[in-house]
Amino acid sequence: MLDLSHNMFVKAVKKSKKQENLSVLKELKNRDKEINKYQREVRRKIVTHFALQNNINDISSIMVLMNMVIDIERIGDYSKNILDLAIYYPEKLNTKELHPDLHEIEQVVKSRFDQTVNAIKTEDVELASKLLKGFKKNVTTASDRIVNHIISGELNFNTGSESAATVLYARYLKRIGSHLKNITTTVINPIDSIGYQSKGIST
């Protein structure tokens, strides 16, 4: 399910860079339905497993998995939003031309997604800790700065559609990054701290 969400995000970003055929974009949007289907299946399997085993020791693992599934599904939703941008934005969504900071956020989130998948599959605590460090500076603060500067009038674009596309894309990337952070915390945090900053780790 995480691989499917990752694949959808990568393709959504790639397709937004070129004026792709409308049918291709809509077909890719439908991948979100697959993610939603997997989410429902995982929930059913979790409930069935717990009902049959009735093992209290499994509760922690079950809650971790449930949290992770929700974050993965949300990433699929935001990837679908990126595809909507590609469909309705009249130009190619070239982040290098729109704003260098937006391009940097895009690259950071893409890299973090690759590494998050790896950290989850290998249960790599060191990699997970590394990913959590610098998240606020490289994603959250950078995204907020772009959005706030546009709203305040400090940052201007040639057209309203450019401004809107930049704001939306910055926000989508920020939210995807946040859900990736939540997923990463499942590797190192106890169940009550999933999605939150660990002590000693500066985000």
Per-range role (PLM):
Residues 1-203:
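Cytosolic, long alpha-helical scaffolding segments
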